[in-house]
Amino acid sequence: MMNEIITSTQNPKVKHMLLLQQKSAERKKEGVFIVEGCQEITHCINNHLPIITLYYCRSLWDQDYSALLSQASQCIEVAEKVYEKMAYRGSTEGLMAIVETKTLSLHDLKLSESPLIIVLEKVEKPGNLGAILRSADAAHADAVIVCDPLTDIYNPNIIRSSVGAVFTVPCVACSSEECIAYLKKHDIQILTAQLQDSHLYYDIDMKRATSIIMGTESTGLTQQWRLAADAHIRIPMLGQIDSLNVSVSTAILLFEAVRQRQCANLS
């Protein structure tokens, strides 16, 4: 129902929302995450993620979002000062939702005939993961697999930087051991990004089932992945700096795979 209006920042529901915003452990415990803004909430709905509670502030609306409210199990109106207290970021059209987490396993993935998968080992920065998910959506990758993650996949910064791609790209968290076994079982070639003993990325055939493995910017990939690789690949560095941001590197490698596949379809 849409008849409750919260005007106090001391309301228990407001305090609960702030707890969820600030504590990853609390989000995991309740099996929920927080989404802000019309675009991100719409992506949740379109990808069948249940909206548990939708908070809204009419005075911040730039258009009528009543149709969006009808998609939530519960809608609660809040005063502008309350919304500003609850919001993690600005410019969210006065819309914020608690959404039920959808946890995928490797076995839930539905792969195409020649899948293209991004694997991230021990990704640290939420902004990088969000940007990579955005690139994965643009490249129509089959999945992003996060091995031994150091950040919550539904971290508010990941949701924001992915512009909702965290809901459109199948994303799985697992151990490196599980991921390697899965890729080997499905005959998906493993290409590890590293500078040493590697081929230029455009010299490798990525038209077949392919996984691109990215490590951390500080230490790269662990020996476990280097030993599991079918090939090591690198992006040529022509300046004085010997590395790129991991999200930029991932996008370059992803779209080389896309280029090769599109050229093959044209021939």
Language-model-detected regions and their locations in the chain:
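Active-site/ligand-binding-proximal alpha/beta "capping" segment
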Residues: L191-I241
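RNA substrate-binding interface of SAM-dependent RNA methyltransferases
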Residues: N46, A79, T103-D197
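Boundary-proximal intrinsically disordered activation/regulatory segments immediately upstream
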Residues: M1-D62, L150-T151
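Short, aromatic/basic amphipathic alpha-helical patches
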Residues: D62-A72
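Structured adenosyl-cofactor binding patch, chiefly the S-adenosyl-L-methionine
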Residues: A138-A139, I153, I158-A165, Q223, ...
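Glycine/small-residue-rich loop that forms an oxyanion/phosphate-binding "nest" at active or ligand-binding sites
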Residues: S73-V99
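Amphipathic alpha-helical repeat scaffolds
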Residues: G37, E124-A131, N245-S249
